[in-house]
Amino acid sequence: MTQCSAFSGIFFRNWIFIRGVPTIQFLPPEGPPEIAFAGRSNVGKSSLINALVQQKGLARTSNTPGRTQELNYFVPDGFSGSKEDFPPMALVDMPGYGFAQAPKNLVDAWTHLVFNYLRGRTTLKRVYILIDSRHGIKKNDEEVLDLLDKAAVSYQIILTKSDKIKSNMLENLMTTTQMSLLKRPAAYPELLTTSAEKALGLEELRTAILQAVVQ
């Protein structure tokens, strides 16, 4: 049995919220592999996490930009958290970036938290950067990708809400996005497309996460 197949049922267990991290000082001790989800505000991070583990209310969703102000940690239930009984992975819902209506002091605080987490977390196996299929990569996304490249943190692009645009437009977006990633050293070459609402691309995402965790 491969390591991936050993973990294959992990997404269908009960998952729980274990910690919100408002500042870098509140990060939990490094333990299980971490998979983080980042993206512009309201790109669908929380909805995708909920769909990924089939728990509708696990990660909070909101129509208010910047509602997720902390790093939110989720793990499968049933593990004590001791060194002998770590969960096989943790999912991290990161604060949205690119919000225009939030006060500057909050924006600065969230930016400091996110950037310092990305730079210094050795158990962080991969960051999934969520891009709204209707809008493509924006300037704020480019800035985060620059940071990840500089920090040599592996990341992969997910085009979310893929059901909201025509298939030919999605194909064109995938082509242009893949071309733009060729010059980025930390980018994983394969794109993923998902729709949390229609449950599209979730199995492919689960497989990609398991591969990242066991590498």
From Swiss-Prot:
- Gene Ontology biological process terms from the UniProt entry: division septum assembly
- What SUPFAM superfamilies is this protein classified in? P-loop containing nucleoside triphosphate hydrolases
Kindly list the organism's lineage.
Bacteria, Pseudomonadati, Pseudomonadota, Alphaproteobacteria, Hyphomicrobiales
**What gene is this protein a product of?**
engB
What's a Pfam family in this record? MMR_HSR1
* Gene3D superfamilies found in the cross-reference section: P-loop containing nucleotide triphosphate hydrolases (3.40.50.300)
CDD domains in the record: YihA_EngB
Residues in a coiled coil are none
Q: Which UniProt keywords apply?
A: Cell cycle, Cell division, GTP-binding, Magnesium, Metal-binding, Nucleotide-binding, Septation
Query: Sorted alphabetically, which InterPro entries does this protein's record hold?
Result: G_ENGB_dom, GTP-bd, GTP-bd_ribosome_bio_YsxC, P-loop_NTPase
Name by which UniProt lists this protein: Probable GTP-binding protein EngB
Q: Does the keyword Electron transport apply?
A: no
Q: Which organism is it from?
A: Bartonella bacilliformis (strain ATCC 35685 / KC583 / Herrer 020/F12,63)
List, alphabetically, the PANTHER family matched. Answer: ENGB-TYPE G DOMAIN-CONTAINING PROTEIN (PTHR11649:SF13), MSS1/TRME-RELATED GTP-BINDING PROTEIN (PTHR11649)
The UniProt record lists the EngB-type G domain at 31-215
Report the GO terms under cellular component: cytosol
Q: Which HAMAP family match?
A: GTPase_EngB
Q: Where does Mg(2+) bind?
A: S46, T68
The role this protein plays is: Necessary for normal cell division and for the maintenance of normal septation.
GO MF, any single term? metal ion binding
Keyword GTP-binding included in the entry's annotation: yes
Family to which the UniProt record says this protein belongs:
Belongs to the TRAFAC class TrmE-Era-EngA-EngB-Septin-like GTPase superfamily. EngB GTPase family.
Necessary cofactors: Mg(2+)
UniProt: GTP binding residues:
39-46, 66-70, 93-96, 160-163, 194-196
